């Protein structure tokens, strides 16, 4: 490669690195507040998200913002959905890690407008609480002094979250929860149970999700539109 060609190539790369604004589905504004590491290809990430997410399930998001945001370091947050926007950290391991974070927040974006499908009827909550009960007995059998009351609450509880991840520990929880929850994080709350299942359905092993969480699997299929609600 001659010097002129190399110069042009490098100039184009530099322009792409400095780019701040993108579009997703032609109607979702994407803004890079803080620069991504060199190994992350944001164009590839966004193209993958467009391919994975059904368009009709993307309409609750107006914008995606990439960077570091207030109070995130204390809360150890990678992403969040708030005010019709997805906020995602620029500190990503690889493209797939970032795709996972974005799709996870798209899941949260549809919880309220599609709650009649996701939560009405109680099947999903019943499945989740049943798994929480089994998790309680499994953790207790490991010698941990735990109260059953916290395990019956399907809402997010920061103290319970700290108990799972700081006292029990991710590795032990992963081992205990294997075959019960698709990921340890799915045990955190009913909302995270749904969101992690949504990611697994779209990016992971659908057969495993159907086996481990059949009620959750059916709810997601209803959302995708592949089967009737009945």
What are these regions (language model features)?
Residues 1-37, 65-69, 99, 161-178, ...:
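Non-catalytic architectural context of zinc metalloproteases
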Residues 44, 59, 93, 97-105, ...:
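Short, well-structured alpha-helical interface segments that form or flank functional binding sites
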Residues 99, 105-126:
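Catalytic Zn2+-binding segment of zinc metalloproteases
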Residues 124, 128-169:
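Low-complexity, serine/threonine/proline-enriched polar segments
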């Amino acid at each position: 490669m001659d010097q002129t060609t190399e110069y042009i190539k490098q100039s184009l790369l530099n322009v792409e690195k400095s780019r701040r604004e993108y579009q997703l589905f032609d109607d979702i504004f994407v803004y890079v507040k803080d620069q991504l590491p060199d190994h992350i290809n944001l164009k590839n990430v966004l193209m993958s998200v467009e391919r994975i997410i059904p368009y009709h399930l993307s309409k609750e998001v107006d914008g995606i913002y990439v960077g570091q945001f207030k109070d995130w370091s204390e809360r150890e947050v990678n992403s969040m959905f708030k005010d019709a926007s997805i906020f995602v950290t620029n500190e990503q391991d690889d493209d797939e890690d970032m795709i996972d974070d974005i799709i996870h927040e798209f899941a949260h974006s549809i919880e309220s407008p599609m709650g009649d499908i996701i939560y009405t009827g109680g099947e999903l909550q019943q499945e989740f609480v049943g798994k929480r009960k089994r998790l309680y007995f499994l953790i207790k059998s490991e010698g941990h002094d735990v109260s059953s009351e916290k395990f019956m609450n399907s809402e997010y509880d920061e103290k319970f979250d700290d108990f799972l991840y700081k006292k029990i520990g991710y590795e032990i929880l992963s081992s205990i929860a294997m075959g019960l929850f698709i990921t340890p994080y799915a045990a955190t709350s009913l909302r995270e149970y749904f969101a992690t299942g949504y990611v697994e359905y779209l990016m992971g092993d659908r057969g495993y999700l159907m086996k481990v969480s059949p009620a959750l699997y059916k709810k997601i299929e209803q959302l995708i539109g592949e089967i009737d609600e009945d």
